[in-house]
């Protein structure tokens, strides 16, 4: 007797009108994560995962491409507004915000949450080239 085919349940994507975009811009890479209000991750993208390797990962264009890929991944959620939280001193800080704006999302606030040490760990030594 033949087995009945197993049907996969179609996941229903819930409508989330406003979300939070976390941008971690380091000197070597840019990580973009979009979460809902509770902090549940909806989508993420990196400059390295977007096809950029080596020193090209740390460019503003690579960060822009990562933000566009992340914005495209959450189109089905019906997001209208984004709150952007930026961490780090990297070159992809402004370009990710511009990419989100160009993707059609209304940005309600841009917050800089870069961690600043109050005389914490010793920084790495200066580069001599």
Curated annotation (Swiss-Prot):
UniProt keyword annotations, A-Z: Ribonucleoprotein, Ribosomal protein, RNA-binding, rRNA-binding
Gene Ontology biological-process annotations: translation
SUPFAM superfamilies registered for this protein in UniProt: Translational machinery components (SSF53137)
GO MF: rRNA binding; structural constituent of ribosome
Any Gene Ontology CC annotation: ribosome
Gene3D superfamilies assigned to the protein according to its UniProt record, in alphabetical order: Ribosomal protein S11
InterPro entries: Ribosomal_uS11 (IPR001971), Ribosomal_uS11_bac-type (IPR019981), Ribosomal_uS11_CS (IPR018102), Ribosomal_uS11_sf (IPR036967)
HAMAP family: Ribosomal_uS11
Assembly mode: Part of the 30S ribosomal subunit. Interacts with proteins S7 and S18. Binds to IF-3.
Cited PANTHER family: 40S RIBOSOMAL PROTEIN S14/30S RIBOSOMAL PROTEIN S11 (PTHR11759)
Function: Located on the platform of the 30S subunit, it bridges several disparate RNA helices of the 16S rRNA. Forms part of the Shine-Dalgarno cleft in the 70S ribosome.
Family recorded in the similarity comment: Belongs to the universal ribosomal protein uS11 family.
Listed name of the protein: Small ribosomal subunit protein uS11
Species annotation: Hamiltonella defensa subsp. Acyrthosiphon pisum (strain 5AT)
Phylogenetic lineage: Bacteria, Pseudomonadati, Pseudomonadota, Gammaproteobacteria, Enterobacterales
């Amino acid at each position: 007797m033949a087995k009945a085919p197993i049907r996969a349940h179609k996941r229903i994507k819930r409508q989330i009108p406003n979300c939070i975009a976390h941008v971690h811009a380091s000197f070597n890479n840019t990580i973009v994560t979009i979460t809902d209000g509770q902090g549940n991750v909806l989508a993420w993208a990196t400059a390295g995962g977007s096809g950029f390797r080596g020193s090209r990962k740390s460019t503003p264009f690579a960060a822009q491409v990562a933000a566009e890929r992340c914005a495209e991944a959450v189109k089905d959620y019906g997001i209208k507004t984004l709150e952007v939280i930026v961490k780090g001193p990297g070159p992809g800080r402004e370009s990710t915000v511009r990419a989100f704006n160009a993707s059609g999302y209304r940005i309600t606030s841009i917050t800089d949450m870069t961690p600043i040490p109050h005389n914490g760990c010793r920084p790495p030594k200066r580069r001599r080239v």
